[in-house]
Amino acid sequence: MKTFKLLDYTAQVFYNKDQHYPFCLHLYDNCSGKQLHVGYYVSVEQLCYMTHLEMLDWQYHALNPVKTLLAVDEMKESLYLLMHVMGED
């Protein structure tokens, strides 16, 4: 499991290469402590795209969509690096 701080959210990403959908995302709102989303994805790209959409859907406060995208891009780069280190790229 890898945990990412994404502005007012926390994303926990789980990876299991033996599953059809190897990536699992748990998205939490840090302000309320609520779990907002659980999803299963095929690729890092799909996971990051859907994380960005979920963050925009759940905004209770006016976050800048560009800042949201940049935070998700940092997560994407970290996941690609992790996949490379694990030899899964």
Task: Tell me what each language-model feature is.
Residues 1-36:
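Amphipathic, interaction-prone secondary-structure segments
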Residues 37-89:
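Mixed-charge, Lys/Arg-enriched low-complexity segments
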